[in-house]
Every structure is written in C-alpha cells, then in structure tokens.
C-alpha cells in the first residue's frame, strides 16, 4: 500500500492510502515518519503511524486543555475520552504529561490548599470531598492536607458569621449556629469550638433579655390559642429553652409576663 494524498486541514493533515483509506494525523506524525505522497507503507508501519497520530493529537488536545488552568489527572483523562482519543492510547499520553510535569496532582492540590489558606473559607473535610470528586487519590489528598493548618481560616469565617448573627440570637443558640455553619464548611467540631473560643464571645444580658421578651410575645401568640395556665407556661418554657435561652432567665421573664 502507498500514500496517494496528503492534504493540510486546519490543525491536522488528511492522509489518503491507496485512494480508499484515509486518516487524520498531526504535523509531528508527518515529520516523525517523513510521510510523503507515493510513499510505500507496510501494514505494521501504517498501524504505528495510526497509534502515534492518536498519541500526538491526544497530547496536543491535553496541552490545550491544560493551558487554561491546572487540571487533575482525571480531568485530563475525561477530556481525552470525551474527544474520542483511543482509550488504549490515553494512558501513554497521561504518563508522558506526568513525566514532563504538565500533570501533577500533588502540586496542584498544594496550590489549591494554599489559595484556600490565603483567601478561602473551607475546612480540610470540604476540600477533601471536592478533590475526591475530581478523581484525586485519597492518599495524595491526605498527604497534602497534613501540611496545612486551617485554624486561622476557621477564625476568619467565624468572625464573618458573627457579624451576621450577633445580636439576633441568645449566646447558646449563637454558638450552636456558628458551629453548625463551620462544620458545613468542612471544619471539624474541635476546630469550630476553638475558633469560637478564640473570639471570646460575651453575653449581652440587656440584648438577650430584649430578645427573650420578644420571643415570649411570639410564642405566646402561638400557644395561647391551644393552652392556658400551667400548661401554657410549660409549652412556653420548653419552646424558649430549645431556642437557646437560659432556664432561669425564662422562669424569671415568665413570672413578670404573667
């Protein structure tokens, strides 16, 4: 068999074999095999050309994909598969890119962890879950995260949350709200507690009393339609206690209220 036509098509070349079979190859393939019109090819040579063409094209696609931002190994694999690169060739491309340090999950995760430390708001658990979803290996993730202490991030997030909720909730409920928000952002329970303790929250008794009386009014409107007397007081007490108000403060306020 021989090459009967070579024609440039944008980024690739169309190579026609015996005017019957055609394939697209990269410029690197043309150069590597010194392909020319009328060149004779054996079956094995043609197979080698096809494989290298896939490898070269796939690598070019991967480098284009990586040029926008750093990618994980799995993201590059998925991208190549999506662009119909031969699944048997993809591992070769990945190995080549890793050898040349175009793909390095460890360094990528280090960079992302540092970004989170500088300007992010996530704890280690949230980062780990996100990276696992991106296909990074658990061992690599754990090795990276052991290098970082996100306690300062937790304090920064707590300060921001405090500005949002302080003065609107009793101290106990405020602390519970802060802990829940911090846990939702991937910080451990202990990290959350430590961050709150660092800020040394102090109860504003005057404000808490005002909040308590406001809540009593609200709950009274709700329960007085169904209960009265001792039963009404019991339901009010239980409801207010669940909302984080101090039991003695509730009892004192209800004595004044009734």
UniProtKB/Swiss-Prot annotation:
Q: Which InterPro entries match?
A: RecX_HTH_1st, RecX_HTH_3rd, Regulatory_RecX, WH-like_DNA-bd_sf
The GO biological-process annotations, alphabetized, read as: regulation of DNA repair
> What is the organism field in this record?
Streptococcus thermophilus (strain ATCC BAA-250 / LMG 18311)
Q: What is its main location?
A: cytoplasm
Please state where this protein is localized. Answer: Cytoplasm
Give the protein's function.
Modulates RecA activity.
Superkingdom of origin organism? Bacteria
Concerning Pfam families, the annotation shows: RecX_HTH1, RecX_HTH3
Q: What's the protein called, per UniProt?
A: Regulatory protein RecX
For this record, an example GO cellular component is: cytoplasm
Q: Which gene encodes it?
A: recX
Spell out the family assignment given in the record's similarity comment: Belongs to the RecX family.
UniProtKB keywords: Cytoplasm
């Amino acid at each position: 068999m021989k090459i009967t036509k070579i024609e440039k098509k944008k980024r690739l070349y169309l190579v026609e074999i015996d005017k019957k079979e055609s394939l697209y190859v990269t410029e690197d393939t043309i150069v590597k095999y010194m392909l020319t019109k009328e060149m004779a090819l054996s079956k094995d040579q043609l197979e080698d050309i096809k494989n290298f063409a896939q490898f070269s094209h796939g690598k070019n696609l991967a480098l284009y994909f990586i040029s926008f931002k750093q990618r994980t190994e799995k993201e590059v694999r998925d991208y190549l598969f999506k662009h119909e690169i031969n699944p048997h060739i993809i591992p070769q491309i990945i190995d080549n890119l890793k050898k040349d340090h175009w793909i390095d999950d460890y360094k990528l995760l280090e960079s992302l962890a540092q970004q989170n430390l500088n300007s992010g708001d996530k704890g280690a658990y949230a980062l780990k879950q996100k990276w696992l979803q991106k296909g990074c290996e658990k061992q690599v993730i754990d090795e990276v995260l052991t290098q970082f202490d996100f306690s300062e991030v937790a304090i920064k997030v707590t300060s921001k949350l405090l500005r949002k909720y302080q003065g609107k909730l009793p101290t106990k409920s405020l602390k519970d709200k802060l802990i829940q928000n911090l846990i939702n952002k991937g910080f451990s329970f202990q990290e959350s507690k430590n961050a709150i303790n660092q800020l040394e929250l102090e109860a504003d008794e005057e404000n808490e009393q005002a909040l308590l009386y406001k809540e009593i009014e609200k709950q009274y409107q709700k329960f007085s339609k169904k209960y009265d007397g001792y039963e009404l007081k019991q339901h009010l007490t239980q409801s207010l206690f669940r909302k984080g108000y101090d039991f003695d403060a509730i009892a004192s306020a209800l004595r004044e209220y009734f």
